[in-house]
Each structure stands twice: as C-alpha cells, then as structure tokens.
C-alpha cells in the first residue's frame, strides 16, 4: 500500500507517518509539505529516518500535486489550522481559502485521477458559532460544565457527552470553519461522483510531545511550554477566569482510527456514514484554569494574567462526542489528559529551545 500524507512535516503528519510505518507492513509513505509552519523543518530528519519520501511542495499549486506519484490513499493533514485565520493579519481571507479549500480541490482531482481513497482531517470548528455559544453550560468548580438540569434531547446535536456530528453547521462558523466545511462537502461529492472512498474526521484539539503549539492552535502544548519557561500567559474572555473547556486527543489515537479506515469501505452514500468525530470526549475535557493547576503542581506556581475582553470566535465549551466512531469501529482514545500533559512536559523539559522552534 502506498499512502500520501499532506502536511507531512507537521505535528500530526509526522505522528501519522510514525504510527502507520509501525502498523502496516511494507507500507510506502510519501509526504508533501510546504514547510511554512514554524518548526516543521525539524521533522525532516524524523521523516527521513522513517523512510518517508518527503516532497517540498505546495498544495495550492496544481502542478505540484500533479507531479506526485500515484498512491492508494491520501491522508489530508495539511491546512492553515487557526480559527483566527483570515482575520488576524497573519494571512488574508484569500490565502486561507487557497490553502484550505484550493489545496483540497487539487487533492480531490488527484484522487479522481489515481482512484485513490481520501481521509480528510477536518475540525470541530465547522459548527455554528451562535449555536455553540448558546449551549446550556455554566461555570462550576473552575470550568464550564453542562448544566445537569438540562432536559435530555432538548439541544439538537449535543448532550452532556459533547457535540455530535449532527450539530448545526449554520453560518457563521468562522472563515476557517467555512473552508473546512466546504472541503468536506466537495470531498463527499467527488467521492460519490467518481467512485473513490472518503472518510472525514472532525478532530478535537490534538496534543502531544513535539507539537509546535500556539495560542490559536495547539493550546495544551503552548500552555505547558510557556508555563515551564515562565513566559506570559493570559486567560482571554469569559471574565478572564480561564473557565473555557476543550477536550484533548493524542495523535496516536487518531492514527489508530485512520489505520482502521484505511482497511474499510464506507457502508452507504449517506454523509452520516462517512463523517466522524475524533476527540477525547468529556473524560479528557479540561479548562485552562485546570491546566494551569496541573502545571503549577508540576513546575511550581506561575501567575496568569486576566483579560476579560472577548476575542472573535472564542467559545466556552467545545467537547466532541465520538460515540459514532466507537460504534462503527469500536474505537476509543487510550491516552487520557494527564498522560498527554506529562508527555508534553517531559518533552518541554528536554527541549528548552522548543518555544523558539514553535514561534519562529
């Protein structure tokens, strides 16, 4: 089997390459990356040691994609992954669309040409921001939590277990979310029209050692590294208390599901049979305040500034209910948050220069 991994030099791409090399005997791995993410250059030697043929190319250029050798499967792990992309001054809206949607379109033409299957890594940020902001949560014991007295089934697509795949995707979802949602739709349409398998994985917050974490993407690794180095940290919005909650997932658990998907065929043409949440779930959900408490215990106290001013697209509670993937593949995350935090902390302690790698 030959697998093409896009964004191969990123944290997720490299993690997938490592896991698939171990899981699939004789697999031929090809990677493509434009190496634009700060820190991605450091993974080139890792990929070389894994026997990955890394192509320095850009998915925005159709000619770069057309020049790639034929593969049996494509795992699309390339994206501008920030929910603030297009509005934060780092990239324009057009650049965001070209990266995320244009790149996926070129890959879909590649899959059509070579009859390759596609696994598209998407995001929890495809969901309606007003609907997410209206979820029945309140601050309890240092974190936003689902209100226990909320009637069952009173919220369409969500429960105390998290957000389900049928939650509203009505705009606004952010420019970033719109590019990923459009990519999902195109992928499903291409797969149906041209007869190749498509799986879509809407991922929660991926976290682990070696991640190039930033405040807007990779928050757990970012927070732990900055806490250890006594760099400034801020609780932004929601009163500046740090109560906002996300669930975390180790990339090895994502890789396990991807491996299962590589040897499976979608059961039916309905989108519901091909779109899955891949997240740590309610058991791995932690607030920033809880993460700080963990860091204080590990590294010693470090003051965090309070900034109550709201930031665009910030939400109090995003937890993914991944029971659809569990039902389909008997898949569950095997690494809990404390294990993930410990792994990140050990890596941070061994690599005092990591923040500089991550921030460029």
Functional labels for PLM-detected ranges:
Residues 42-44, 67, 130-134, 211-215, ...:
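Short aromatic-enriched loop/helix-cap "lid" or pocket-rim segments at secondary-structure transitions
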